[in-house]
Regions:
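Gram-positive cell-envelope targeting signals
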Residues: 1-47, 55-60, 80
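Bacterial extracytoplasmic/cell-wall-associated proteins, especially those involved in peptidoglycan
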Residues: 37, 44-194
Length: 194
């Protein structure tokens, strides 16, 4: 009798998952990362929807990650710090500045708006940026950031440039080939006081 109940429960769970449109053992985040690297927005969006449904139906304690943000953050990390020899910390620091800007009262509140702001990053409808296919390392850095991991842990760091900006340099990253990248604090640090 116990064996029949186990088989029946397994069959019901499988049928429930199949009706739901997701597979319980599929790693949809891995599919999202693959889609980012392949430049396949439709596949990534579909995987994100299935992942969100799986998290909700199975009551999993996973952070929600929007595919649009994973897509854009992976691309900007690749554009700004995609060189294969640059360490993961550098890639994540670049991405964290974008997230800090999204949370800042000084900048727009969405990733797309932050990246498309005039004079910042690559702007709107940029063929170079639009055509980028990030490396898996850049996509992984974006995933880690969107899931809450931080390397700077300083919300007031809202500038990343080849020269000093803002009120202070928080961190200078140096590379023999690329030179220095400065991660700088806002000109209005009082906005970030806890």
């Amino acid at each position: 009798m116990k064996r029949i109940l186990i088989i029946l429960c397994a069959a019901l769970m499988t049928a429930s998952c199949a009706a739901a449109g997701y597979a319980p053992r599929t790693d949809y985040m891995a599919e999202m990362l693959e889609a980012v690297c392949a430049g396949d927005y439709a596949a990534g969006s579909a995987a994100a929807e299935k992942r969100a449904e799986k998290i909700a139906r199975m009551a999993l304690d996973y952070p929600q990650v929007e595919f649009e943000e994973l897509w854009l953050l992976s691309k900007i990390i690749y554009a700004e710090a995609g060189s294969v020899w640059l360490p993961m910390e550098w890639k994540m620091a670049v991405g964290e500045v974008v997230l800090n800007r999204m949370a800042s009262p000084e900048f727009p509140g969405t990733m797309r708006e932050v990246l498309e702001q005039p004079g910042q990053y690559y702007g709107k409808n940029n063929p170079y940026f639009d055509g980028l296919k990030p490396s898996i390392e850049c996509a992984e850095a974006a995933r880690r950031l969107l899931e809450g991991e931080r390397v700077l842990r300083a919300p007031s760091v809202v500038f990343q440039s080849n020269y000093r900006l803002g009120s202070a340099v928080f961190l200078e990253l140096k590379d023999a080939l690329l030179g220095s990248t400065y991660l700088c604090v806002s000109s209005h640090p009082e906005l970030y006081a806890a």
